[in-house]
Amino acid sequence: ALLGPGERGEIVVRGSLVTPGYYRDRQATAEASRFGWHHTGDIGYLDDDGYLFIVDRAKDMVITGGFNVYSTEVEQALMQHPGVRDCAVVGLPDEKWGERVVAVVQAQPGTDLREAEVIAFVKTLIGSVKTPKQVHLWPDLPRSKVGKVLKTDIKATLGAAR
């Protein structure tokens, strides 16, 4: 169903310029192509003028206590802290809440960054539900060959450390 302005949902597209499928990957094609529409895996919304805004990847969204928390929103709040050089936000399993928001932060050189300080800072910007419950300080974030942060590696590392 088409959502109203400002309502967030998965972006789906169709047309002559949309891929007919993933190269040699029938399963991914079947998952993305449903009812003649290509499901992008992106969450977004249309504004009142019909402009499309991408909010996050659906797979990066954290569902905690019934609330949808977009990792990009939390990352943008973290990046406002002067001691944060880079960051990534993931969801980890939580018995009570389903998932909990967890951040991995790379500090600015020469900064003595503390977990409690970062959590308190973010809480003032986006509220307690979206604020990371844990902040891990890492010297570097894992990246792909093209420089993209590998959130799957972060989740695997943090999940294995439990």
Task: State where each predicted segment sits.
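AMP-binding/adenylate-forming catalytic core of the ANL superfamily
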Residues: 4, 10, 15, 20-21, ...
